[in-house]
Swiss-Prot record:
It catalyses: a hydroperoxide + [thioredoxin]-dithiol = an alcohol + [thioredoxin]-disulfide + H2O. This is Thioredoxin-dependent peroxide reductase, mitochondrial. Homodimer; disulfide-linked, upon oxidation. 6 homodimers assemble to form a ring-like dodecamer. Interacts with NEK6. Interacts with LRRK2. Interacts with MAP3K13. Interacts with RPS6KC1 (via PX domain). It comes from Bos taurus (Bovine). Thiol-specific peroxidase that catalyzes the reduction of hydrogen peroxide and organic hydroperoxides to water and alcohols, respectively. Plays a role in cell protection against oxidative stress by detoxifying peroxides. Acts synergistically with MAP3K13 to regulate the activation of NF-kappa-B in the cytosol. Required for the maintenance of physical strength. InterPro entries: AhpC/TSA, Peroxiredoxin, Peroxiredoxin_C, Thioredoxin-like_sf, Thioredoxin_domain.
Length: 257
């Protein structure tokens, strides 16, 4: 009886170990959840060949593209410290910055989320909302918000943190790393009609520029309002170009004196 139980245990253990993603040790996979998350995080940020091998997004879903309608999403978010169901429909008539980050309680992620939150009023001034998304639960989001910033937490938030626990939103937006089961740093600017105007995806170790995101929102809005196009490094104080062979000369003569 004992021998049979031992064989069953060893067979179960072998199956468990064989299912562990590359770049993560068997001993790490058997640790408690918090320890496993730290091990997973270290492996993904290590830049090793095994970690890079795990960086494969799903090929069974059509990735969204600029000029196409944004994939629909719905889920539970933490908004002003409360749980709230939100969806893409809630942002009709507004610009939306939807950005994905890998995990709560990590390192680069809080710097990005806090930076967007601190600039929330400037986004609101141009009729734009900001929503952050990760594969963590809304309970994890709330716990992170309730953690002081000096301890790596988020503190008070002026933007929504959306839970994608099923990973379906990340998958639909083409940013899910199927192996480790987390999202790359994808950022989408969606216009009031639900059309994607901009998308970018960073590898895990590098954060994004909030100032550049705000500049892009303003640029797309300027084009819509004035019918002129925005040159490289455009700011609201910069000259723009009339998209016509003759009329465009005004701009080129002005900047090339």
């Amino acid at each position: 009886m004992a021998a049979t139980a031992g064989r069953l245990f060893r067979a179960s253990l072998i199956r468990h170990v064989s299912a562990i993603p590359w770049g993560i040790s068997a001993s790490a996979a058997l640790r408690p959840a918090a320890s496993r998350r730290m091990c997973l995080t270290n492996a993904l940020w290590s830049g090793s060949d095994q970690a890079k091998f795990a960086f494969s997004t799903s090929s069974s879903y059509h990735a969204p593209a600029v000029t196409q309608h944004a994939p629909y999403f719905k889920g539970t978010a933490v908004v002003s410290g409360e749980f709230k169901e939100i969806s893409l429909d809630d942002f009709k008539g507004k610009y939306l910055v939807l950005f994905f980050y890998p995990l709560d309680f990590t390192f680069v992620c809080p710097t990005e989320i806090i930076a967007f939150s601190d600039k929330a009023s400037e986004f609101h001034d141009v009729n734009c909302e900001v929503v952050a998304v990760s594969v963590d639960s809304h309970f994890s989001h709330l716990a992170w918000i309730n953690t002081p910033r000096k301890n790596g937490g988020l503190g008070h938030m002026n933007i929504a943190l959306l839970s994608d626990l099923t990973k379906q939103i990340s998958r639909d937006y083409g940013v899910l790393l199927e192996g480790p089961g987390l999202a790359l740093r994808g950022l989408f600017i969606i216009d009031p009609n639900g059309v994607i105007k901009h998308l970018s995806v960073n590898d895990l170790p590098v954060g994004r520029s909030v100032e550049e995101t705000l500049r892009l929102v303003k640029a797309f809005q300027f084009v819509e309002a004035h019918g002129e196009v925005c040159p490289a490094n455009w700011t609201p104080e910069s000259p723009t170009i009339k998209p016509h062979p003759t009329a465009s000369r005004e701009y080129f003569e002005k900047v090339n004196q």
